[in-house]
Design a protein with these regions (language model features):
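ER/Golgi luminal nucleotide-sugar-dependent glycosyltransferases, focusing on the catalytic module
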Residues: 1-231
Length: 231
């Protein structure tokens, strides 16, 4: 039995010129039927609305269904070039000219990030996120390769607070109008499309805080800090 499972999260049809080993060993997962050149595909059943939670939906499903100790997750447009073989790997950090907080405020919505931080019930977590948002670095995209246990810890830190926050959003328009976000995100030309991305915008920043503040080391050599008991 293999000790790893490789997944590709697919929102749309894709038929890339991927090598045969990739087509044979990666399993496509989606919330609706999509076409691909992968050998195996699964349409997942979920309690979450994919329009609101994006990749968090898939991670939740993987944690409930994956039977191997190691896992890799790829986006259908961003793929790892080999199966998972060892320690956690994630996207390369990108240095920012401004803090992650100011970057989010300018590109998306200051009110959105302020409201999210205010919604955090745990004071230690709120302090950690507030300080983490002052970093001038971001780890983008949605690639992961490593132990399923680390993915579960990521989920507890990143996904759970976002899910609770999303449940409380009554009107996304206040975030869209406040920042002119639809003008910046020209491809997402209405508030419904923007709403689909809110969880993704937040999870990208929370993921950065998880890897840089909750974990230590560098990509490929990640170990959890023992003093973060709230995870």
């Amino acid at each position: 039995m293999n000790n790893y499972t490789n997944y590709v999260i697919a929102h749309k049809d894709f038929e890339w010129n991927t090598p045969q080993w990739y087509n044979d060993t990666f399993t496509q997962i989606s919330t609706h039927k999509v076409k691909s050149n992968l050998k195996n595909s699964i349409v997942i059943d979920t309690d979450y609305d994919d329009k609101l939670y994006g990749e968090i939906t898939y991670v939740d499903w993987i944690l409930k269904n994956c039977k191997t100790p190691l896992v890799s997750i790829n986006h259908y447009r961003r793929i790892l070039n080999a199966p998972v073989i060892g320690q956690p790997v994630f996207s390369k950090p990108i240095n920012l000219l401004v803090t992650m907080y100011d970057h989010f405020s300018a590109c998306h919505s200051k009110k959105l990030i302020d409201d999210f931080i205010a919604s955090l019930a745990d004071d230690n977590l709120k302090k950690l996120v507030t300080e983490g948002m002052q970093q001038k670095v971001i780890i983008p995209y949605n690639l992961f390769s490593g132990p399923l246990q680390v993915l579960a810890q990521w989920y507890n830190f990143v996904a759970q607070p976002i899910i609770e926050f999303m449940k409380g959003i009554k009107n996304v328009e206040k975030y869209v109008k406040e920042s002119g976000a639809l003008d910046y995100n020209s491809a997402r030309n209405n508030s419904i499309e923007y709403q689909k991305r809110i969880a993704a915008f937040l999870s990208e920043r929370m993921s950065t805080i998880f890897w840089t503040r909750v974990c230590q080391g560098v990509p490929g050599e990640v170990s959890l800090l023992e003093d973060n008991q709230h995870i």
